[in-house]
Amino acid sequence: KGVEIVIHYNKSKAKAEKLKKELSTNDTKVYLVKGDLSIENDVIKIIKFAKSKLQYFDCLINNASLFENDKLENFNTDSWGKHLRTNLRTPALLSKEFAKNIKSKNNNIINIIDQRVFKLTPYFFSYTISKTGLYTLTKTSAMSLAPNIRVNGIAPGPTIKNKRQSE
């Protein structure tokens, strides 16, 4: 039966449109919404948009994140705050609103964490702190929202080769 999906993007409009095209088959409807997850008003706009398009929510995937390299010795409060807002506060806000808009049982929240929360290093300080917070949010949300909502985290290792990695 028909599936409806809301996909958020910030700077990757072309990739979001490509994904929409790939997913828009048969009875699947895909809606795109732009917003900066570090800005609370944008998050509120995304929530309102999703509510306007979907009758109810049954799955939330918190996948977006900010990933910048810093260390305790050189981090700045702007980067620290943006990491916490994007990687921790926004998933908390989205999870709260998700829980208010479910129809029945068997709902899911999936938080994409990072293997770094289990293998700590001094690198990517702000990112790692925000993702360890998301790990804790995942565990406490699972306890709070059960049994109607399952909350799980996925902690992958590197998934995309970047300029700091070799073949």
For every predicted segment, state its role:
Residues 1-6:
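Canonical Rossmann dinucleotide-binding motif of NAD(H)/NADP(H)-dependent dehydrogenases/reductases
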Residues 13, 34-46, 77:
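The beta1-alpha1 cofactor-binding region of Rossmann-like NAD(H)/NADP(H)-dependent oxidoreductases
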Residues 17, 156-167:
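A glycine/serine/threonine-rich, flexible loop-to-helix segment
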Residues 46, 61, 94-98, 102, ...:
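Hydrophobic positions on the long internal alpha-helix
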Residues 63-68:
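Conserved NAD(P)H cofactor-binding loop of Rossmann-fold oxidoreductase domains
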Residues 71-72, 79-84:
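Substrate-binding pocket helix/loop in short-chain dehydrogenase/reductase
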Residues 108-146, 158-161:
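Catalytic loop of short-chain dehydrogenase/reductase
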